[in-house]
């Protein structure tokens, strides 16, 4: 993937090839500027690749598609709309009758602990609550693939840990979440090695720009994940392996 900058062509990604299985949780880690966010935008159909191709469910991605939901680092909630109306926005943008999705919107908000906040404005919510609303919005049309671009990066450490557990619960690791084959496929970008190891089935480690795959590391940790998993020897070994890959200097 090459794009034009003021200083000339910039190669953001090179020779990226990997697949993600249905219902799998895959994390992407790498140094700043290695193309992680660019890769997500290509998968989402927001940016066309300059070489190669991307497919979702076997179909090439050439434009934004309904099968993909996206959550950004900032919640990007419209400040003049209520929480409920923000969650319903994807239905409106897709030309669908929003009132048909009100029931699902209420269910999602209840699932993430925002029941009773439907009529609130974004400014009345904490950062973590805003990000919960953003997650509900991405899930409204029930996309099988969820792309998450550092969604918890701006949160404090304790709220971030809470959101990690909340995400796993919604994904299907706890009561009330999806089960088995109903789980979403998630591609999750983060700068946090512990977050990647805690959440993912596999961690894709990327090299500096142009971003390439340095290694794909299976997490190998049992599910459901618990807070105690962070203290396990296997967790520490994998986190250290990824850290060594990211800090390795070329010979």
State the predicted function of each range:
Residues 202:
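Short, glycine/charged-rich "phosphate-handling" switch motifs in NTP-dependent
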Residues 206-238:
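Conserved beta-strand-loop-alpha-helix hinge in the C-terminal portion
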Residues 1-194, 199:
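ABC family nucleotide-binding domain
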């Amino acid at each position: 993937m090459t794009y034009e900058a003021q200083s000339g062509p910039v190669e953001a990604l090179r020779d990226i090839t990997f697949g993600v299985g249905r219902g799998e949780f895959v994390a992407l880690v790498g140094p700043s500027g290695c193309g992680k966010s660019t890769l997500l935008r290509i998968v989402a159909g927001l940016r066309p690749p300059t070489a190669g191709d991307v497919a979702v469910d076997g179909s090439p991605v050439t434009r934004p598609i309904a099968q993909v939901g996206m959550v950004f680092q900032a919640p990007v909630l419209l400040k003049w709309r209520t929480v409920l109306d923000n969650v319903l926005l994807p239905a409106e943008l897709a030309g669908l009758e929003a009132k048909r999705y009100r029931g699902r919107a209420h269910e999602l908000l209840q699932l993430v602990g925002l029941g009773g906040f439907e009529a609130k404005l974004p400014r009345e919510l904490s950062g973590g609550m805003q990000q919960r609303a953003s997650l509900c919005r991405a899930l409204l049309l029930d996309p099988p693939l969820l792309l998450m671009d550092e969604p918890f990066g701006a949160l404090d450490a304790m709220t971030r840990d809470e959101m990690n557990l909340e995400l796993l619960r919604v994904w299907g690791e706890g009561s009330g979440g999806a089960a088995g084959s109903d789980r979403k496929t998630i591609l999750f970008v983060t700068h946090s090695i512990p977050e990647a190891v805690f959440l993912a089935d596999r961690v894709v480690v990327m090299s500096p720009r142009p971003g390439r795959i340095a290694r794909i590391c299976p997490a190998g940790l049992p599910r459901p994940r618990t807070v105690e998993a962070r203290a396990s020897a296997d967790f520490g070994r994998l986190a250290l392996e990824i850290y060594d890959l990211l800090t390795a200097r070329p010979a």
